[in-house]
Amino acid sequence: MKIFSWVANKISGKQEANRFPANSSAPYRANVSDCRKDEFSDWPQSLLAIGTFGNKQIEEVAQVENSSDNVQSVQDTVKFTEEEVDKIRKEFETLLAIKDQAEAQRSHDDDQVGLQKRADGEDNEKHIRQLINKRIIVSKSKNSLGKKGNTLKPRSVASLLKLFMCKGGFTSVVPEPRNTFPQSRMEKLLKAILQKKIHPQNSSTLVAKRHLDWKPDETEINECLEDALRDLDDDGAKWVKTDSEYIVLEM
């Protein structure tokens, strides 16, 4: 209602100003301004928020209200008892301990992961080195076998061609010089001499049988050989000494 009355007064004031002359306008304006101040002083601060008037006052009022709310909240926090404060402090301590444990566990896990990665890397390096060494050994062995095969084949073929062309084919092995005189004949001769010395009066049949079955000792053989050599020396025969045996030559 005051707003409507203010608007009506403003309109009536303008009309009155138009009625009065210019000389009498000054005192009237002073009266109008005083009336406006009185009207504005009676209005509440909430109505001034509609227009542009009273912004600074509204901000000051808001700051005062916020400060009062903060003071009230501080007073409310001060109302905690000692038991509640201890309980809150314990909860904070447990939270901090849990946080420290989690950080320690995380750092331990990171260390374990790093060690595992290092061990895996070392194992992989060892495995790679072993594979490289095996490949090097296999390649070297293949190269050596290939070289040996290439060098042996021409030599064998060349040697076979030389033997075939020079000697007219493959011949048997040449016997050694001491195999020219058969060993069986020498054995027969020695056994006959020994048989004559041991059994001089037996017949030829008994001599043949005992010659096949008799096996003298080394001492008997040596004695018989010495006696045979003496008899041969007395008869005028000669013994020719070779590398392995004694050969009897009749004069």
From Swiss-Prot:
Q: What's this protein's family per the entry?
A: Belongs to the LAZY family.
Coiled-coil-forming residues are 64-105
Biological process terms in GO annotation: positive gravitropism; regulation of growth
Name listed for the protein in its UniProt record: Protein DEEPER ROOTING 1
Q: Does the keyword Thylakoid apply?
A: no
Something else known: IR64 cultivar shows shallow rooting in an upland field.
Concerning what turns on (or off) its expression, the entry says: Negatively regulated by auxin.
**Which PANTHER family does this UniProt record tie to the protein?**
OS03G0406300 PROTEIN, PROTEIN DEEPER ROOTING 1
Q: How is it used?
A: Introducing DRO1 into a shallow-rooting rice cultivar enables the resulting line to avoid drought by increasing deep rooting, and to maintain high yield performance under drought conditions.
Which residue numbers does the motif IGT motif cover?
46-52
Outline what the protein does.
Involved in the control of root growth angle. Involved in cell elongation in the root tip that causes asymmetric root growth and downward bending of the root in response to gravity.
Query: Is Transmembrane helix included in the keywords of this UniProt record?
Result: no
Record key words, sorted:
Coiled coil, Growth regulation
For this protein, the record's InterPro entries field holds: LAZY
